[in-house]
Amino acid sequence: SGKDSFIWPNSWIVLVGLMCFIVYLAEGIMLDWSALYLIEEKHIATAQAGLGYASFSAMVATGRFLGDGLVQMLGRVRVIVGGGLLAAGGVALSIISTHWGVSLLGFALCGLGCANVSPVLISSLSKQTYMPTHLAITAATTIGFAGVLAGPAMMGAVAHYSSLSAAFAVLAGLLLVVAAFGHRFK
């Protein structure tokens, strides 16, 4: 039937998508910019520059493996708010540190913070009744994945006109926005 062929997402679904956009933006920036950041800003050897994304990714994987238990223990709101704060704090730590090793720790904390935010956000769409769940998930993840695709280019523009540290500071600020809106997911 043509009943659910196209439905504009409502503001709740768009909010979930935008919050996922920010979290996926963090992943895209870590993938595309962390090595260059470590080389240019923290003076790490080129051969070790991949450690930035590796530390981020390892903690995303670890966090996801522990995710169900964390959500049961802490609840959805604390996972989103705490994850946003931890991720923002990790990025901030990487900016203010003077040693690349501390920046790696910051990237790891960012990964741990981001790990369960998007899964919790996406799972929240099962509670909405505006549109069929599969369409709501599709709409939100489409918005979210634009963060991986377009985000690094946007941050590249920020870095071009200022610095890589400024681009990472923008990311930290956006992750604080995720934390600020986390209370809406009770």
Task: Give the residues covered by each predicted segment.
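Extracytoplasmic gate region of multi-pass secondary transporters
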Residues: N10-S57, A61-T62
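Helix-breaking motifs and short loop linkers at transmembrane-helix boundaries and internal kinks
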Residues: H43, G75, I96-T98, Y130
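Helix-to-loop junctions at the C-terminal end of transmembrane segments
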Residues: G63-G75, A159-H160
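Structural signature of the two symmetry-related core transmembrane helices
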Residues: R78-L93, A169
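Paired small-residue
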Residues: G90, G101-L109
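Intracellular juxtamembrane helix-capping segments at the cytosolic ends
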Residues: A115-T129
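A late C-terminal transmembrane helix in Major Facilitator Superfamily
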Residues: T129-L164
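Multi-pass alpha-helical transporter architecture, strongest
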Residues: A172-K186
